[in-house]
Each structure stands twice: as structure tokens, then as C-alpha cells.
Amino acid sequence: MGFTDKQEALVNSSWELFKQNPGYSVLFYNIILKKAPATKGMFSFLKDSAGVVDSPKLQAHAEKVFGMVHDSAVQLRVSGEVVLGDATLGAIHIQKGVVDSHFVVVKEALLETIKEASGEKWSEELSTAWEVAYEGLASAIKKAMS
């Protein structure tokens, strides 16, 4: 079964909720660093700070990550596959030392952040929609890394 219109709508509506509050970007990186403190140096906007400090670069990167997952949902519904819009993503992830376990951490942080942003609209169906979209993106990045 492919990605459905309803799943895309769920991702769209919660993506809008995420974008309304810049605090969710800080939450996202706090969750990542709590789960995998060693990843701090992988992010240029975090490596020289004492912790997660809100900044334009942090906001831009979080919006890019969540935006790419959102775009993946659209691609999955339309064509059933995710094609990276940025051909350098594989090389960047290799350069930063990203390994499979990092993709799991980011997925968990993404889902926890969307759960917080969605509030009472959170459901297993919403979680699954984001998870499938993220897995599509992660698979495309991993393919570009090989």
C-alpha cells in the first residue's frame, strides 16, 4: 500500500503546527543531544556552544530537516519513492560521520517533536505517516551515501 492522501494531509497539518513555534527546533536538537550527545560536533551551529542555543542557523537546519520529510511525504504519495532534491546530501552525511544509528536518533527526535507540536491531534496514524515519510527520506540519503 502506498502513501495515502490522508497520510500526506496529516503530515501537512502537523508540519504547519511545527513551523508556528520556533521552540520546536530547539526541542528537536535537545532530544537529539539527549539521546546521542556525541553528535553535537556534527552540527556547526552546536559544536562550539554549551548546549542547544536558539539561532537562525539552528532554525534553518531544523526547518530544512522537517521540510524534507514533509516533501518526502508528497513524493511518496505522488510517485511512491523519494528523490533527493540536493545531490550533495549523501556526501555531507559521510563527511559528518553519520551512521545508521544516527538516522534512528533523528527519527525518534522528529517523532517526539511532532508529538509535542501536535498536542491533542497526536495519534498513531499521525506518527506512522511521519515515520514512513522519514524512512523514505533516510533511505534516499543512505543510498546517496553508498
UniProtKB/Swiss-Prot annotation:
Modification comment: Nitrated in effective nodules and particularly in hypoxic conditions; this mechanism may play a protective role in the symbiosis by buffering toxic peroxynitrite NO(2)(-). Nitration level decrease during nodule senescence.
GO biological process: nodulation; response to abscisic acid
SUPFAM superfamilies: Globin-like
The protein, known as: Leghemoglobin Lb120-29
Residue list for modification Phosphoserine: 44
Residue numbers carrying Nitrated tyrosine: 24, 29, 134
Tissue: Root nodules.
Matching Pfam families: Globin
Inducing or repressing factors: Strongly reduced levels in boron-deficient nodules. Inhibited by abscisic acid (ABA) in parallel with lower nitrogen fixation in nodules.
Keyword flag Chloroplast: no
